[in-house]
């Protein structure tokens, strides 16, 4: 297959017109379409120069989505690392979030466990695992479960 620079640019612009992507993610998607690595590198550089591609903007967008879906800080970090976003960019995206992760964990626990926090060991462990899976750390989980218990 013979792909030229214009075709690769067009593919990149179509992808970026739908939503933000990380540099790595855009590179992978263009490679899946069969574009040569040299051409992809040139196109990524081109869209970066135009400001169409930004890991910082992508990280901020992902952070808003994660918070809106009720996931925690750990989950956000994990997802951004999977997309090969730089650690500094992740830290910046987290710093821009004005969310109280403790209160978010409490809201998620309250929404999921309407019947209240269980004092039975196996059920309590299940609730802790659920909040861990959602990306909350142990301090946030402890706060959420204790706060939910005192709300009852």
Curated annotation (Swiss-Prot):
Which Gene3D superfamilies does the UniProt entry name for this protein? Winged helix-like DNA-binding domain superfamily/Winged helix DNA-binding domain (1.10.10.10)
Record-linked Pfam families: RecX_HTH1, RecX_HTH2, RecX_HTH3
What UniProt keywords are attached to this protein's entry?
A: Cytoplasm
Work out whether the entry's keyword set contains Secreted: no
Cite a single GO BP annotation. Answer: regulation of DNA repair
Among InterPro entries, the record links this protein to:
RecX_HTH_1st, RecX_HTH_2nd, RecX_HTH_3rd, Regulatory_RecX, WH-like_DNA-bd_sf
Could you state one GO cellular component term attached to this entry?
cytoplasm
Q: What subcellular compartments does it reside in?
A: Cytoplasm
The record's similarity note reads: Belongs to the RecX family.
In UniProt terms, what function does this protein have? Modulates RecA activity.
PANTHER family on file: REGULATORY PROTEIN RECX FAMILY PROTEIN (PTHR33602:SF1)
Question: What protein name does the entry list?
Answer: Regulatory protein RecX
């Amino acid at each position: 297959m013979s792909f030229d620079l214009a075709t690769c640019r067009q593919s990149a612009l179509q992808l970026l017109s739908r939503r933000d992507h990380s540099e790595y993610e855009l590179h992978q998607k263009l490679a899946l379409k069969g574009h040569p690595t040299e051409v992809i590198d040139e196109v990524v550089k081109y869209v970066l120069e135009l400001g169409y591609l930004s890991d910082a903007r992508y990280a901020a967008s992902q952070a808003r989505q994660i918070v809106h879906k009720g996931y925690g800080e750990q989950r956000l970090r994990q997802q951004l690392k999977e997309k090969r976003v730089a650690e500094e960019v992740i830290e910046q995206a987290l710093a821009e979030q004005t969310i109280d992760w403790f209160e978010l964990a409490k809201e998620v626990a309250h929404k999921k466990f309407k019947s209240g926090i269980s004092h039975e060991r196996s059920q309590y462990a299940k609730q802790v695992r659920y909040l861990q899976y959602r990306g909350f750390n142990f301090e946030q989980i402890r706060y959420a479960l204790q706060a939910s218990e005192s709300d009852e």
